[in-house]
From Swiss-Prot:
It comes from Pisum sativum. This is Cytochrome b6-f complex subunit 4. Belongs to the cytochrome b family. PetD subfamily. The chain crosses the membrane at residues 36-56, 95-115, 131-151. One of its GO terms (molecular function) is electron transporter, transferring electrons within the cyclic electron transport pathway of photosynthesis activity. It comes from the Eukaryota.
């Protein structure tokens, strides 16, 4: 048997909070044992039942067996590796390519130190961080799109 706390509605601080919609839920049921013992197992068992039902109704196919002699001409990685793949593909020296990849997190680590005087959270009032983000996004998209093209068109994206 849970003990529920009754609010003191004569308290002016609580009345001001309730008027603004900031009060706590004093009128509801306690979370223990009602939520944890009754509602959570229903949600968990319902999720498991949905997963089992989908697995029975729509099983995923295993696919064709792998044929090592029938590989494509150019193997592409997953989409999230496209920028890294493009760097390694276009830079002639592999050590330079690895150093370029290491320089990205190193450059991102320096941004807070470059802008440590600026305490604003608004991105329009933090020009260094906003510029680094925009340039990094454009470069990542450029490299990602270029990785899907042939090597001759990959740097210019076929525009020039």
């Amino acid at each position: 048997m849970g003990v529920t706390k009754k609010p003191d509605l004569t308290d002016p601080v609580l009345r001001a909070k309730l008027a603004k919609g900031m009060g706590h839920n004093y009128y509801g049921e306690p979370a223990w044992p009602n939520d944890l013992l009754y509602i959570f197992p229903v949600v968990i068992l319902g999720t498991i039942a949905c997963n089992v039902g989908l697995a029975v109704l729509e099983p995923s196919m295993i696919g064709e067996p792998a044929d090592p002699f029938a590989t494509p001409l150019e193997i592409l990685p997953e989409w999230y590796f496209f920028p890294v793949f493009q760097i390694l593909r276009t830079v002639p020296n592999k050590l330079l390519g690895v150093l370029l990849m290491v320089s990205v997190p190193a450059g991102l680590l320096t941004v807070p130190f470059l802008e440590n005087v600026n305490k604003f959270q608004n991105p329009f009032r933090r020009p260094v961080a906003t510029t680094v983000f925009l340039i990094g996004t454009v470069v990542a998209l450029w490299l990602g799109i270029g990785a899907t093209l042939p090597i001759e068109k990959s740097l210019t994206l076929g525009l020039f």
